[in-house]
Amino acid sequence: MVTTGSRTILVAHPGAEMFGSDRMLLESVIGMVETGARVVVALPARGLLDGALRAAGAEVVIVPMLVLRKVLLTPTGLPHLFRDLFRGLGAAWRLIGRVRPDAVYVSTIIIPQWPVIARLRRIRSVSHVHEAEASGNRLVNALLYLPHLASNSTLVNSRFSLDTIRGALPALARRSTVVYNGVGSPDDPEGPRAEIDGALRVLYVGRLSPRKGPDVIVDAAAALRRRGTDVTVTLLGAVFEGYEWYEEQLREQAASAEVDVVFAGFHTDVWPFLAEADVLVVPSRVDEPFGNTAVEGVLARRPVIASDSSGLREAAGGYSTAQLVPADDAEAVADALTVVRAEWPRIVSEVDAARAEGLRRHAPAIYRAAVAAAVLDTAL
């Protein structure tokens, strides 16, 4: 581990919730704090992440910043984009001048002002890319990645992300290094039940959005019900503001299909829900740069069914207790759930080996050390 008692790292992050990229930001900051560095985190708002960062030993400041969202690229959103851009540039310039960091760590590509201002301030910076949509417009991808050429180096969370960058902006890919996400878990998670008596308990963890595909699980459960198999579904997550219509649509879908669906809402602690589940399904319709949720399922000693696409292949691939299925295919998910039920004794016998492999691949300590070393080496 790199150790330092005299360096200051400024970290910029676009949100204050506790979803995937937020949790990885927290792990990154813990790694930096463990080196003895002073770590100052800039957020655009207060939230659950704010308190977790302070508990980890970081300082937190709230500053205006441009956070790229699709809504800003609409005719009504453009005035807000330019307002946030100029406010964000000024705030970043002033904060870097006040903190005087040795390095700036930019978490995600959707806060483009930070590497640019760091370069203008002659402060070295590291960008960490958690976003990748190979199926997206290549020009749009290139424009999103372009500001991060101002960083001195780039970390990416999967080979898929690296390949996506290479297809859009080869110059950035040549300066990028893959660091797989570190995923924490309980020391001794509850094992699966010895046999399935009654309904198969299916769990979904994540945002309730069409892109993430929880409706695919409801359709798969309906298909199993038609086949005579009893299934219960728990949806652990909430909608983005403005997507309340989608949750209502899910509720209507479940009621119409007569599927037993529990809307559990958002919880920061997913492990009790994994302990109650038999199988975790990750049915994303769109490209995922990685798939922390799939790894959490493996670490929880549960079988996993995930879309056979993008970074999910890296997250869920190579485990005997995980199945990859075509994206947006409810019948394929239903077939995979049938396999889980039919092969339950084998799965139960193999979940410990799968967990051991997941721990090897995604140990938080290794991730923290790798990110801290990249940032501090950049500052040398």
Region roles according to the model:
Residues P303-A306:
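Short hydrophobic beta-strand element within catalytic cores of glycosyltransferases
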Residues E247-G265:
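Nucleotide-activated donor-binding/catalytic signature segment of Leloir-type glycosyltransferases, i.e.
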Residues P345-L376:
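A charged, aromatic-enriched C-terminal amphipathic alpha-helix characteristic of glycosyltransferases
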Residues F160, G182:
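Carbohydrate-associated surface elements
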Residues G47-L48, L89, A103-R121, G136:
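An aromatic- and histidine-rich active-site surface loop
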Residues F19-I30, L200, Y204, S209-A223, ...:
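A conserved mid-protein helix/loop that constitutes part of the nucleotide-sugar donor-binding site
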Residues A42-L48, V183, V205, T232-E248:
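Glycosyltransferase donor-sugar binding loop
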Residues G318-E331, T338-W344:
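Conserved acidic donor-binding segment of nucleotide-sugar-dependent glycosyltransferases
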